[in-house]
Amino acid sequence: MKIYLKFKSYNKRICKLLQLFKLEHDQNCSMGLLINHNSLELYNRDNVNQKPIKVDFTSKKNHYRCHHFRRKNEVLYRVSGIKNSYFPTVLDATAGLGNDAFIFSFLGCKVIMIERHPIVAALLKDGLQRGYQDKKIGHWLQTRLHLIVNDSLKMLEIPILQPDVIYLDPMYPFYHKKSLPKKDMQFFRQLIGHNYDSKKLLEVSRKLAKNRIIVKRPYYAKPLSEDKVNHIVTTRNHRFDIYQPF
């Protein structure tokens, strides 16, 4: 895939990632990848003031969320099905920047992320490699959070362990200004586009998961399926629809 490549400094590890995901320099591309010392960052060449995007499992936001974890306040704990010593295996079929997958792994679940876009996959792989080396989280992150580069619609064909839970957070259209995400995430959406196959992805997920499928939706959005939603958990801005497998 073609993208503008900018090197702030040479990094052998990141150069290997660029080769692995076949990312090649394109002088005319409006999106760029910045090799910023020890991290890979996506940035908007048309807006140099916009903050670059990177996957950082050691961020202050993640640290705060983990440090202040309370069962009743963490919605992913409530929808996951975790009970006592039971920690379900989770397949995140819409990995994005890996934020929710990281929380599932922090909670004790073994998580596999699937991502088909080579640029996003490179960002995730970079974040994982740095996270694995972190002194605070690396010891458990290495055993709980992993990435598969593939199309989620083909996950029935992937020879992986059948997960207990499949998690879906598909992109959805925004109908009014107040519902728009931050500018950096709007830019990220431009890269990966909308998920026009979300309903089909839910159908595939219900054929694979053992126990449940969790679909994250905005509070105003219609369910992905006309079938009955078995359970619903709501927050201020989102709704988590839980379906049973076929």
UniProtKB/Swiss-Prot annotation:
GO terms for MF: rRNA (guanine-N2-)-methyltransferase activity
Class of the enzyme per the UniProt entry, highest EC level: transferase
Keyword flag Coiled coil: no
Function: Specifically methylates the guanosine in position 1516 of 16S rRNA.
Keywords, in A-Z order: Cytoplasm, Methyltransferase, rRNA processing, S-adenosyl-L-methionine, Transferase
Annotated protein name in UniProt: Ribosomal RNA small subunit methyltransferase J
Residues given in the record as S-adenosyl-L-methionine binding sites: E115, R116, D169
